[in-house]
């Protein structure tokens, strides 16, 4: 189904299909709280995470996380590899055996660092160049790889736009690096299995990368990535728009088995 909608260039349908797979594997709805995918955690337990974040954070000596726990990535950051921190959150209402099951799930969750660059032909050599991958061609442009500027805390109007040639092929290079969450556990084949206790059979962890233009609801590229053990690099080829002006492409890094771990990045282009 995903291949079919990708062939048609249907962005919204591709995202919906991926979300459907996530819901089937975790046996939860997309609109459910992501912490409810954790074994033994039900809706009546969610207040424990809010209570800890406001009243017990200093006492529990969690990691560098400073906000209320409202998602799986925030829970991972708050625990910072310490089962004792998780126990301090859940011990008022869960037994030690249930907390151990929760920790086995949380400590195995994949958290990815994502960096994005664009490789192609440019008119000038800007300061955002990452590396030189070729000399000057007949068109007068240098072929380099440029980092996509981060949008954190910067208004959309103030973004550093990447200048591209119209209707020319470029390559979006996505580097995925997995956080070391296993704390000394041996690397092995079993580690590639996803944490899906409500799914009837074992499933390998994988990721789906989708590049699209939201304004036109158009899917530009899609690629599946298997289990990320340490770090991996993925390339997505795309063409710059034929029309001149500014546009925004969006990269979606989506799990094919977990709810609440997806990431997205805007790539601001000026043609």
Walk through the language-model features, giving the residues of each.
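C-terminal helical accessory/scaffold domains
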Residues: 1-55, 69, 76-82, 104-135, ...
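Short beta-strand edge segments in extracellular beta-sheet folds
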Residues: 266-271
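A eukaryote-biased signal for short, well-structured alpha-helical docking elements
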Residues: 83-111
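Short acidic/polar inter-strand loop motif in beta-rich domains
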Residues: 253-263
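Helicase-associated low-complexity/disordered flanking segments
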Residues: 189, 263-265
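Short, hydrophobic beta-strand segments
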Residues: 223-226, 232-243
